[in-house]
């Protein structure tokens, strides 16, 4: 996972952090598509972002394989909280993709 900052997430920086996370994740998506190429067959890509020690944001993109340039930004974000196994378990199948 990508470590962005250390420390706690404060409420006044949540909007700017979400914007930063979305731009970083978009870049990761493009990089993943570049590395995997047309052989990549799953319609879902997932990226997890670890912020500090106790806060996490999980984003899932639905990739339209018919139109590879069109990415539906269907975000599933976990509540800001502890990044433990119980809260991450529902996303675990997606994190196996792209080495996350």
From Swiss-Prot:
Keywords: Membrane, Transmembrane, Transmembrane helix. It is found in: Membrane. The keyword Transmembrane applies. The chain crosses the membrane at residues 20-37, 44-61. Its main location: membrane. GO terms for cellular component: membrane. It is a multi-pass membrane protein. Partially overlaps SPS110. This is Putative uncharacterized protein YDR355C. It comes from Saccharomyces cerevisiae (strain ATCC 204508 / S288c) (Baker's yeast). The lineage of its organism: Eukaryota, Fungi, Dikarya, Ascomycota, Saccharomycotina.
